[in-house]
Amino acid sequence: MKLPKAKNLNAEKYVAGLSLFKQKIAKIKLSANESALGPSPKAIKEYIKASKDFKRYPDSDGTFLRKTIAKKFKLDQSRIILGNGSDQVFELICKAFLQKNDEVIVSQYSFIIYRIYSKLNSAKVIYATENNFTSSVDTILACVTNKTKIIFIANPNNPTGTYISKNNILKLRKKLRSDILLVVDDAYFEYMNLKNYECGLKLFSKFKNVVVTRTFSKIYGLAGLRVGWGYASKNIVEALYKIKPPFNVNRPALIAAAAAIKDTAWLNKEIHHVRKWSKKFYDIFKELNIHTNKTGVNFLLINFDRVKKTSQ
């Protein structure tokens, strides 16, 4: 009997960061860079209230949350699109802009989801080598061809924790062709406190060929609710809305996210906690001669090759 056959999907499967935690070997799960303190108590309270009424569909465009985001960051509400996590925004970008034989440039050690969605939409992924685990603007520019369509940059980067300076990322956009879409992933920007760093939203909010994405999964502690968003020109956002699934973010998630973004005190508490403990861990690893990156985010990258040599 001949059965239905799926088309050839030229992409690797995303494997969630459960590692040894799922096997109950690890006591604390660290592999997904989730919030240390969890969600704001105000967000939890609003989520519980909203969870008592499931019979109504959510606002398909998430108008209330988009309005809250726009007010918080002084943005144009009509240029905001919500996703079921920022992952979905990346998926929509790839669906809307990529065709067969297009090329997408990603950094050598970048978030895997960029290349998964690029390949699923028939694009060729080009890997720009990194310098000491840091994305190189010159190397990225050297990878550009007449087929380049999108460049994905996480700044700061996951999983390395390194970043591209303000001047260098502006240089990247300036030297790219205007028809190449630059996507800047701001997932971890809130933790950064370095003079030569600036978030994508502040640098590119007025650009018509840049999409900046953000998430509620990290510093806001709402990873289980799946809420992310993108900010781009009206033309780009209109294209994404044409293919965005209806009701893609559930109502309790929308309401909890709106409460979370307003709770500045809780946000600052999380930032203080992360900065305090990342410095402590860095100093401990250094004392033990374990090589790691000095980071401005909520995770550390450890070189286990050096750890092995040290232990020997």
Locate each region found by the language model.
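N-terminal "arm"/small-domain region of PLP-dependent enzymes with the aminotransferase-like
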Residues: 1-56, 68
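Phosphate-binding glycine-rich loop
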Residues: 63-103
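PLP-dependent aminotransferase-like
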Residues: 96-153
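PLP-dependent aminotransferase class I/II
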Residues: 209-285, 290-293
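Conserved PLP-binding catalytic core of the aspartate aminotransferase-like
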Residues: 285-312
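Short beta-strands and strand-loop turn motifs
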Residues: 127-128, 150-156, 182-186, 293-295
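Active-site pre-lysine segment of PLP-dependent enzymes
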Residues: 119, 137-146, 159-182, 186-219
